[in-house]
């Protein structure tokens, strides 16, 4: 059985580094907005959706922050103010600290 080949770099999936490179190159913005009834919502945007599965990432962040959330228009929305925690977790997941902007 042949190993799966990455369509971007042509290497086998276990040797592929496309996702790590993509994580380091992205400019991610994390900020909080007020929604209905004065509720806070953490918005995370700036991901390259061709490489990163936003639904899977949102699921992990919701589990870590113990909150609800969704994916809309290439952004992740989490209920509550989780800016610091999300930034720390993204760094642990391999995103560059320099590419994350917290407002």
UniProtKB/Swiss-Prot annotation:
Keywords: Protein biosynthesis, Translation regulation
Residue stretches spanning the membrane: none
PROSITE patterns, sorted: SUI1 (PS50296)
Cross-referenced Gene3D superfamilies: SUI1-like domain (3.30.780.10)
Organism domain of life: Archaea
Pfam families: SUI1 (PF01253)
A Gene Ontology biological process term: regulation of translation
One MF annotation (Gene Ontology) recorded for this entry: translation initiation factor activity
InterPro entries: DENR/SUI1_TIF (IPR050318), SUI1 (IPR001950), SUI1_arc (IPR022851), SUI1_arc_bac (IPR005872), SUI1_dom_sf (IPR036877)
Record-stated family: Belongs to the SUI1 family.
Record's protein name: Protein translation factor SUI1 homolog
Organism lineage: Archaea, Methanobacteriati, Methanobacteriota, Methanomada group, Methanococci
């Amino acid at each position: 059985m042949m190993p799966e080949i990455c369509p971007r770099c042509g290497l086998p999936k276990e040797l592929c580094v496309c996702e790590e490179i993509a994580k380091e190159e992205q400019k991610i913005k994390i900020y909080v907005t007020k929604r209905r009834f004065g509720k806070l919502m953490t918005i995370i945007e700036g991901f390259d959706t061709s490489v990163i599965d936003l639904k899977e990432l949102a699921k992990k962040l919701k589990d870590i922050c113990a909150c609800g959330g969704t994916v809309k228009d290439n952004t992740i929305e989490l209920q509550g103010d989780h800016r610091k925690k999300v930034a720390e977790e993204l760094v642990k997941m391999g995103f560059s600290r320099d590419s994350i902007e917290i407002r």
